[in-house]
């Protein structure tokens, strides 16, 4: 299924040219930032971007929460739980974020890796038990809704592993991304999620967005699909946009 909001944004950009600007959102992170979900304090070791070798940091891993506002180029409906409950995970270990901080983000509809979507699909499979995607009660955004801080920590670590591990392996104990000092429950959830990679369906590209900022941690969150309208409707939209451009050119 295609995502209509991305389609119409693309059509508008192609048709209107310079009239189109990047989609943005302002996020105020909760204080504490793990409000309602909790976290696990762990050690992570990763490649040093500025020199040879690696860096090791002691960090809190878990799902972030905040409030969104000042939308430009997107509608509030693209955020699964609304702007007052904006759930997300860190997608950038080389920057930082603080409790209560305000950050202006660019909404990126193609900022995540396929490997990340594979992991999140595995998370959904575990979190939904034996339910299928069409079953009543199935949560397609279960990865955004951890029930405990240990679940959230395991999801966050898997997201980092999906992005920063240079090999195809899924092993937090070795490689270019390493995590240690996990609580036992975090390890249990990580192993459960890892065990479903490859046997569960990856998330579709349209189901995930990233929030990007060059100076602060990028975030990753969910993006609910919107059905594409009938071809006749799309043709009318394209024609209207083309007419808008033509009118502006005549005025110029």
Regions found by a protein language model. Give the residues of each.
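C-terminal membrane-anchoring or membrane-association module
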Residues: 245-252
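Short, surface-exposed polybasic-aromatic patches that bind anionic ligands, especially phosphate groups
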Residues: 24-225
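Short, threonine-centered small-residue motifs that mark membrane-proximal processing/anchoring sites
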Residues: 2-25, 217-245
């Amino acid at each position: 299924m295609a995502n209509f909001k991305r389609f119409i944004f693309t059509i508008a950009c192609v048709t209107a040219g310079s009239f189109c600007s990047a989609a943005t959102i302002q996020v105020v992170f909760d204080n504490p930032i793990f409000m309602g979900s909790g976290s696990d304090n762990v050690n992570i070791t990763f490649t040093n971007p500025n020199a040879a070798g690696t860096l090791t940091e002691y960090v809190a891993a878990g799902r972030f929460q905040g409030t969104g506002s000042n939308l430009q180029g997107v509608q509030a409906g693209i955020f699964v739980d609304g702007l007052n409950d904006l759930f997300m995970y860190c997608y950038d270990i080389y920057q930082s974020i603080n409790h209560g901080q305000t950050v202006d983000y660019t909404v990126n509809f193609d900022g995540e890796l396929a490997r990340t979507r594979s992991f999140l699909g595995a998370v959904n499979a575990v979190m939904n038990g034996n339910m299928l995607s069409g079953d009543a009660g199935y949560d397609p955004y279960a990865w955004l809704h951890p029930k405990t801080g240990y679940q959230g920590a395991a999801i966050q670590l898997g997201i980092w592993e999906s992005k920063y591990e240079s090999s195809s392996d899924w092993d937090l104990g070795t490689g270019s991304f390493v995590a240690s000092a996990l609580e036992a429950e975090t390890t249990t959830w990580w192993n459960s999620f890892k065990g479903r990679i490859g046997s569960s369906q990856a998330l579709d590209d349209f189901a995930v967005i990233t929030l990007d900022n060059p100076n602060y941690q990028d975030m990753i969150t969910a993006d609910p699909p919107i059905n594409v309208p009938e071809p006749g409707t799309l043709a009318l939209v394209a024609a209207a946009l083309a007419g808008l451009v033509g009118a502006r050119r005549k005025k110029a």
